[in-house]
Amino acid sequence: DVTRVYLYPEQSHRGRVVLVYKDKVKSLDKLVPLERNTFFSDMDRVAKALKKLYAPQALNYGNYGDIDKKVAFHIVPKYENEFEWNEPFAINPEKVFLTQEEYELMAKEIKKAIK
């Protein structure tokens, strides 16, 4: 794998994660085709795991080339008639933070579902 998956600290969208390329590369165009294809394949695996676990009606993907220090994509589950449905997601709405135990449980569930 060429990626690392991090549970996003703010969980207004249950299951939100950030998929980060393992090396310090700033933009997708700096990756060779095999690396880029592997990164997107990993993204697909993570997306399928999130759909299986949380059953969102949609997944939004965000890449912030001017903010992120590495190639990174936010994968944001969206739920109909809930927060920010039919709107772009905020980078950090500061609304929902879990306990450490809840983060650990969610991370374990996601990790298991990705395998």
Can you describe what each PLM-predicted range is?
Residues D1-K115:
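HIT superfamily nucleotide-processing domains
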